[in-house]
Amino acid sequence: SMCGGFPHIPNKFKYKFSWSPLGVLRALNTPCKFIKNYKEETSDKAFRQISKMNFNGEEFEIYPNRDSTPYLKEYLSKEYIDKVKNFQRGTIRLKGWSKEWNKIFLKLDENSNLEKISSELWDKNKYQTNEKDRILLFVRFFAKYQNKIVYDKTLYIDESRNIENSAMSQCVSLTMVSVIECLIKNNTNPGISRIFNEINRVDFI
């Protein structure tokens, strides 16, 4: 399960900001955990686990987002969890992103002042009013039995918008609107609960 936002037309830095870069920096500086070859893999910083990904004929870079393992039970029944070979929730970036960000990674390694780095990045790489952003979000399930593919399905969103009505903001806000409508029309009980834990909510969305 991967998601990322980036410029519709790639810039040299391979990234632009529509709000404070501090959140991106903190996420990169955070430990991560995921499943690889049936085992839990960990890293003290997410940017140490960058890998390549091809999607619809386009090459991207990806890295894990914090701890993926608690989400296994959201995707799979309990009896299948121990049989999972690879499982990762992560962030998508444009091809060449890690090369352009190498100096930033070195500063993160040195525990430099994140607020200062954030301010510098914002000044140099924020979206301008005439630019477009792009989001790519996808979930892929891939299964084999006796070395044969028995299931392979991908659901995705690939959207670009003018930054004043950005694809990122639309993705977040439209999801929130759908959730609110679901709560109102399905007479949900008061309290905190996950929106997709009840079949009537899933069907509605």
Identify the role of each PLM range.
Residues 1-205:
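C-terminal catalytic/substrate-binding lobe primarily of soluble NAD(P)-dependent oxidoreductases
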